[in-house]
Amino acid sequence: MHQYLDLLRRIQAEGVTKTDRTGTGTTSVFGHQMRFDLSRGFPLVTTKKLHTRSIFVELLWFLRGDTNIGWLKDNKVSIWDEWADANGDLGPVYGKQWRSWACPDGSTVDQITQVVEMIRKSPDSRRLIVSAWNPADIESMALPPCHCLFQFYVADGKLSCQLYQRSADVFLGVPFNIASYALLTHMVAQVTGLEVGAFVHTFGDAHLYSNHMEQAALQLSRAPLPLPRLELNPEVKDLFAFTMDDIKVVDYQCHAHIAAPVAV
């Protein structure tokens, strides 16, 4: 995972001080890209322990089209709690945009179903895109999408994915984002009969919060360990049929967890 550590180092070396919505303050760079060959291991950060259950449950929650934290809570995941209202609602966030994008005529578009079918039928299409950034809905969202658009690419029987992330909390959020979209790429590849290619992660504003600088330095003092493997239940052929029982990470070696506050 040297790609991730290189981003931490770049922010330390080149970052500029900026104010932000949360009032915490950040050190930020603009424009960065990381590339991971998914055939060489599952890209879980190893220089601190990640709670993989939260990552995987959240992705399944997105794919359900859900925007209420109730299902997350039922599955012992609390990463969205700070943004939910008293009823657990978050507004039209990722799940709504992915599975039920509202059209002006009152109809909706299931972007995930659509892109999977396009991969199967038109793998060379340059329109294999899913967007969570819906300007008409931004003000109704508890938190506008940070990872806001992704595109699939098929070549030589392999499926690759590129994510554009407008805003990236590099210490807390980015390790989750890498693993989430790597998992999604594996899942979509399996249900479309493809092997995995690359995950490309492209950033707009990539930042470390001012109260994460010491934690980032600690992480950089640790040597990365070999990447684990991802194993999916090969019997699952429907993207929406995956459950936590179908997802397994093997040989995840990692350093100890590093605690850090969430900027809300």
From Swiss-Prot:
(6R)-5,10-methylene-5,6,7,8-tetrahydrofolate binds at H51, D169, A263. Pathway: Pyrimidine metabolism; dTTP biosynthesis. GO terms for molecular function: thymidylate synthase activity. One of its GO terms (cellular component) is cytosol. Keywords: Cytoplasm, Methyltransferase, Nucleotide biosynthesis, Transferase. It is found in: Cytoplasm. DUMP binds at R21, R126, R127, R166, S167, A168, D169, N177, H207, L208, Y209. It comes from the Bacteria. Its EC number is 2.1.1.45. It catalyses: dUMP + (6R)-5,10-methylene-5,6,7,8-tetrahydrofolate = 7,8-dihydrofolate + dTMP. One of its GO terms (biological process) is dTMP biosynthetic process. Belongs to the thymidylate synthase family. Bacterial-type ThyA subfamily. Catalyzes the reductive methylation of 2'-deoxyuridine-5'-monophosphate (dUMP) to 2'-deoxythymidine-5'-monophosphate (dTMP) while utilizing 5,10-methylenetetrahydrofolate (mTHF) as the methyl donor and reductant in the reaction, yielding dihydrofolate (DHF) as a by-product. This enzymatic reaction provides an intracellular de novo source of dTMP, an essential precursor for DNA biosynthesis. This is Thymidylate synthase. It comes from Paramagnetospirillum magneticum (strain ATCC 700264 / AMB-1).
